[in-house]
Amino acid sequence: MDLMEYQAKELFAKHDVPVTLGIVAHTPDEAQAAAEQLGVVVVKAQVKAGGRGKAGGVKLAKTPEEARTHAEAILGMEIKGLRVNRVLIAPAASIEEEYYFSFLLDRANRRYLCIASVEGGVEIEEVAKTNPDAVRQIPIDPGAGVDEAKAREIVADAKFPEALTEQAVQTVLALWKVFVEEDATLVEVNPLARLAGDKLEALDGKVSLDENAEFRHEEHASFVIREEEDPLESAAKDKGLNYVKLDGSVGIIGNGAGLVMSTLDVVAYAGEKHGGVKPANFLDIGGGANAQVMADGLHVILGDEQVKAVFVNVFGGITACDEVANGIVGALDILGEDATKPLVIRLDGNNADEGRRILTEAAHPLVTMVDTMDGAADKAAELANA
């Protein structure tokens, strides 16, 4: 779960990261009132996307009236397809230098990684291109974590100014607490700023929380803003489905994350010869492919206007293919007139022959059965491009 800046800063404050919270405003009036309290402010769009400044979503306001004007312009704008419904009114800071700092999960190497740079305030990818030596990558042993000695190593490696060493060490330790104690997969500060008087402060923040650890953090539910979530992802979550919306036109249903990921790949490959068709989603129904689960999955996918065809790819294991086939037939009966797009079904594994027989006898006009994964992907891409 990605957090907005103001939410990330709340976690920073909780763990003693130096930060000023500011005031969240939903209307121009609220923005003006906040600026009257804070003085010179920065009006910052709150969306889960980068590039807010380039998009015109971050503006300096020297008066409350100017804050109101900026809020009027920013509220309702779209940044990378996301509508801005709130702004953060943050006190303007006198910045002397800007640094970059992050902890993240390095999945490829099965470890944590710290990235730090004394050239912050801009996209770290750009710094890595123009001055790679300024971007330091420090691996973190998951067993050892970050203690004071490791924090000092990080600060020294990143070449933070000597005058800021002690503050930087304490800030690194505090950010590590955010990362570990909140079960985050990313904690990023850009910029971590040196203010007048050699004071360090996190002026912006980005945090991604591991949704698999939600059971340990009931308090994280307060970060969920339902009206800002993708409606299809919200509907899938309510039904207990593992769904991620993508930008293609072939809906994907499979049992098992590995199989679904492979299905995305073969559909993308097949789509290259069918007008650039791509997968529309990731949807893993797991092992319980009964009629209701299939109906729930199909209902979510068919609710995506971009979907032109659906590829159901199932390998029967614990859940036999005849159960899956009965689930598909039952799902189509449940959906009735809501089922309007062609389905390509590929069954393999336990009781696959019986599953195919059930679907053949049902003879639903929307269903096409294909024996191979590549063939089914090609057919689904063809139908989506028809």
UniProtKB/Swiss-Prot annotation:
Pathway: Carbohydrate metabolism; tricarboxylic acid cycle; succinate from succinyl-CoA (ligase route): step 1/1. Its EC number is 6.2.1.5. Substrate binds at residues 255, 317-319. Its cofactor is Mg(2+). It catalyses: succinate + ATP + CoA = succinyl-CoA + ADP + phosphate; GTP + succinate + CoA = succinyl-CoA + GDP + phosphate. GO terms for molecular function: ATP binding; magnesium ion binding; succinate-CoA ligase (ADP-forming) activity; succinate-CoA ligase (GDP-forming) activity. Coiled coil: none annotated. One of its GO terms (cellular component) is succinate-CoA ligase complex. Belongs to the succinate/malate CoA ligase beta subunit family. Heterotetramer of two alpha and two beta subunits. This is Succinate--CoA ligase [ADP-forming] subunit beta. The lineage of its organism: Bacteria, Bacillati, Actinomycetota, Actinomycetes, Propionibacteriales. The gene is sucC.
